Design a protein with these regions (language model features):
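Structured, helix-rich domain cores that form ligand/interaction pockets
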Residues: 1-231
Length: 233
């Protein structure tokens, strides 16, 4: 099942309202972390019972706050943002992830990903221990770092074991699609499901069909029109 693994949004609302609403929804408290980045004045962590559940940048030259969450905290964050600001946030980054397991899983997925990359003449990069099949696992990247759409195939179980999670399944493999949308696609993906994120590029749609067995429609921000009151801001 495809799930969100990262969601970053610029929210068109007052920073104090954004922080307060998210803290209430996520059962968290804000902690000031000093100066922000990318022109923002403040950086805050929203901390729940088990740690940081979201982060917020606010103030400075940017009129609207920017917030994001990752990993297991993403779904609750997405629900909160879309529930409070369904028509008033844009997405700057969204990751969709699918998990696999079983004997031979890595080799099968690697073959499919490399085949698609070669067919579409996409850049391939590698990280991890490819020579010795080491315990820390391997990662395959499809697409360049600067591309709006990039995929990662990696041995999640081995990564977690290297991080101290000793009972993580050794054959756990994850395929992720990272999308940094441009122009009107920032609005389109603000309502997309995790599966629909795979429609962000021609090659990612094909990969979804080949690996996930799911046919998805093209994400085309040019077909989206802003409401008059949004365009006027």
């Amino acid at each position: 099942v495809t799930a969100f693994d990262w969601y970053a949004a610029t929210i068109r609302d007052d920073p104090a309202t954004v922080v307060g609403t998210l803290c209430t929804a996520l059962d968290a408290s804000p902690v000031q972390m000093g100066r922000g980045m990318h022109g923002y004045e403040q950086s805050l962590e929203l901390r729940g019972r088990d740690g940081v559940v979201a982060r917020v940048l606010a103030g400075g030259v940017n009129p609207w706050p920017h917030a994001w969450a990752s990993g297991d905290d993403t779904d609750a964050f997405v629900e909160s943002v879309r529930g409070a600001w369904p028509d008033w946030h844009t997405v700057s980054r969204v990751d969709a992830a699918d998990d696999f397991g079983g004997a031979g899983c890595w080799d099968r997925l690697l073959s499919e990903c490399v085949s698609e990359a070669e067919t579409k003449n996409l850049r391939i990069d590698q990280a991890g221990d490819w020579l010795r099949d080491g315990e820390h696992g391997r990662t395959l990247y499809i697409g360049s770092k600067s591309s709006p759409v990039r995929a990662r195939l990696y041995e999640k179980g081995k990564q977690l074991r290297g991080d101290g999670v000793k009972d993580a399944p050794i054959d756990w493999v994850r395929l992720e699609l990272q999308v940094r949308p441009e122009n009107q696609a920032k609005w389109t993906l603000a309502t997309a499901s995790p599966s629909e994120v795979w429609g962000s590029a021609r090659w990612s749609r094909t990969l979804s069909t080949r690996v996930l067995g799911v046919d998805v429609d093209k994400v085309d921000g040019r077909l989206w029109h802003e409401p008059d009151d949004v365009r006027a801001l």
